[in-house]
């Protein structure tokens, strides 16, 4: 087997894409996990305090701010993928790199596969990173809704002027 055959085999199997993709997937998931846990921790503490202080509208505000932060986390990860594609000169410009990353990360696939030969598998790895990140985010959002729903219900109980003993039983 000659060097040319080895290079062709490496390219045909997309080995550089696997190595680069798995490394980036790990980096993206580490960033995602760190930021996600920070958002969740801050939401849980603040919403618990606001519930205990009967500041039910503040719980909703913190909930929506947390959702915005989760969204921004995903945007950051798409940009991180885009920058990495551009740094490795896999796409012609940063804008196209970010757009391609977003298209694959969200699994929407609205862009053509413009990656060079030997790097095609990278699109699938980016899609997996997005699926993993969205699943993790969804699980955190589900846990966040408990305090949000409790605050929402308590706020409406107060607006309906239900007796205090009824409201206290709900807590």
Stretches with model-predicted labels:
Residues 56-76:
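Interfacial helix-start motif at the membrane-water boundary
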Residues 31-47:
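Membrane-water interface of transmembrane alpha-helices
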Residues 54-63, 104-118:
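Short membrane-interface loop/juxtamembrane segments of multi-pass integral membrane proteins
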Residues 44-57:
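Membrane interface segments of multi-pass transport proteins and intramembrane proteases
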Residues 1-16:
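Short, strongly hydrophobic alpha-helical membrane anchors
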Residues 23-32, 96-101, 110-152:
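Pore domain of cation channels
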Residues 149-171:
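Short, highly charged, low-complexity non-transmembrane loops/tails of multi-pass membrane proteins
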Residues 72-100:
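Outer-pore turret/helix-boundary of cation channels
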